[in-house]
Amino acid sequence: MSGMEATVTIPIWQNKPHGAARSVVRRIGTNLPLKPCARASFETLPNISDLCLRDVPPVPTLADIAWIAADEEETYARVRSDTRPLRHTWKPSPLIVMQRNASVPNLRGSEERLLALKKPALPALSRTTELQDELSHLRSQIAKIVAADAASASLTPDFLSPGSSNVSSPLPCFGSSFHSTTSFVISDITEETEVEVPELPSVPLLCSASPECCKPEHKAACSSSEEDDCVSLSKASSFADMMGILKDFHRMKQSQDLNRSLLKEEDPAVLISEVLRRKFALKEEDISRKGN
């Protein structure tokens, strides 16, 4: 009996009878049962053969949560022990299909929704393409201005004098240059509107209108100067178009500068700073006079 009593384990709070009321820890130990909690158990899915299990357990684990959340266009979830064939040929078996937990969010779907919201809308893309087209058109017009320097020499007063023989051909073309200014219009929504320009009268019509051009001695001179006149007049018309655009830009800039100057004059901070500057300037002048 003495050997059996020596092997019995006695808790420390029961070793001394008078020690149970001596500390709070011993009082808690006497009231609470110090037994381990029961372990959580999972039920295996029914009617699953050993061939389907392979090397992985049929019980779902924490690793399946990310797998379930990554599923797309699926209202069900499966354990990792199942094989995943092609999407268009796979049909779930009713024995191994589990109901998907609604509390697990589909993170990939929300990310795709955010990316779709960040994409620019179609009107913005069309507006950008329109702006790019307008910039390219302006660049071509500026290039024509640079090329029109050579045409400015041909449009001298000597060229337009009454005694010159080329007066009959260029005069109708200047009327067309007035109409060609409407071929490029910058509106508030930065769109380009092309207006049909009446075609220039042909050279034979001009020659038929003037009897001097129909003479045989003037035919060679008219044929040689036709190409030069057409090139110079086309350059002059493009130059007139671009000059009108530049004038509009200059007027807009002047109106903006005028509005800014008016706002600057009406700004109270500007008025206060101007008064303080004058006041300190007068004080400095008085101090300099007294020092002298």
UniProtKB/Swiss-Prot annotation:
It comes from the Eukaryota. It is found in: Mitochondrion outer membrane. GO terms for biological process: aerobic respiration; mitochondrial fission. The keyword Hydrolase does not apply. Its main location: mitochondrion. The modification Phosphothreonine is found at residue 30. Keywords: Membrane, Mitochondrion, Mitochondrion outer membrane, Phosphoprotein. GO terms for cellular component: mitochondrial outer membrane; mitochondrion. It is a peripheral membrane protein. The keyword Mitochondrion applies. Phosphorylated by AMPK. Upon stress, phosphorylation at Ser-103 and Ser-238 by AMPK is sufficient to induce mitochondrial fragmentation. InterPro entries: Mtfr1. Changing residue 238 to D: Leads to fragmentation of mitochondrial network. The modification Phosphoserine is found at residues 41, 103, 110, 224-225, 238, 261, 273. Mitochondrial protein required for adaptation of miochondrial dynamics to metabolic changes. Regulates mitochondrial morphology at steady state and mediates AMPK-dependent stress-induced mitochondrial fragmentation via the control of OPA1 levels. Belongs to the MTFR1 family. This is Mitochondrial fission regulator 1-like. The gene is MTFR1L.
